[in-house]
């Protein structure tokens, strides 16, 4: 346990004598790939291309139009779902299914 604590302290020490941190797993015959952290720092400011516009606008204090559109889409989906459930229930209740069909596997969700 003491060895693990000592190793953790060694890993947390800042860079000394201008040495770069090397990735773990490097052994004999392994050539370091260079400073990859510098490359990551260059790419970090360009992250916004991966985020949908709706999230960027909301994060920047958007005017709420996107939320209104989203809520309208959700209402439309709920309306269509209710319509499909009701249609299925009416079909079962009206007896449009053939008489030899087993009704035990049918179900009806009433809104």
Swiss-Prot record:
A motif (Nuclear export signal) lies at residues 77-87. Self-associates. Binds to the DEATH domain of p75NTR/NGFR. Interacts with 14-3-3 epsilon (YWHAE). Interacts with DIABLO/SMAC. This is Protein BEX3. It comes from the Eukaryota. Found in ovarian granulosa cells, testis, prostate and seminal vesicle tissue. High levels also detected in liver. Residues 68-111 are annotated as: Interaction with 14-3-3 epsilon. InterPro entries: BEX, TF_A-like/BEX. It comes from Homo sapiens (Human). It is found in: Nucleus; Cytoplasm, Cytosol. May be a signaling adapter molecule involved in NGFR/p75NTR-mediated apoptosis induced by NGF. Plays a role in zinc-triggered neuronal death. In absence of reductive stress, acts as a pseudosubstrate for the CRL2(FEM1B) complex: associates with FEM1B via zinc, thereby preventing association between FEM1B and its substrates.
């Amino acid at each position: 346990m003491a060895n693990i604590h000592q190793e953790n302290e060694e890993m947390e020490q800042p860079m000394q004598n201008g040495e770069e941190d090397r990735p773990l797993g490097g052994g004999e015959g392994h050539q370091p790939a260079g400073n990859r952290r510098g490359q990551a720092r260059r790419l970090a400011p360009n992250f916004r291309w991966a985020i949908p516009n709706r999230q960027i606008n909301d994060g920047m204090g958007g005017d709420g139009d996107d939320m209104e559109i989203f809520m309208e889409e959700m209402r439309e989906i709920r309306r269509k779902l209710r319509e499909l459930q009701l249609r299925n229930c009416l079909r079962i209740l009206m007896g449009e299914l053939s008489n030899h069909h087993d009704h035990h596997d049918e179900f009806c969700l009433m809104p």
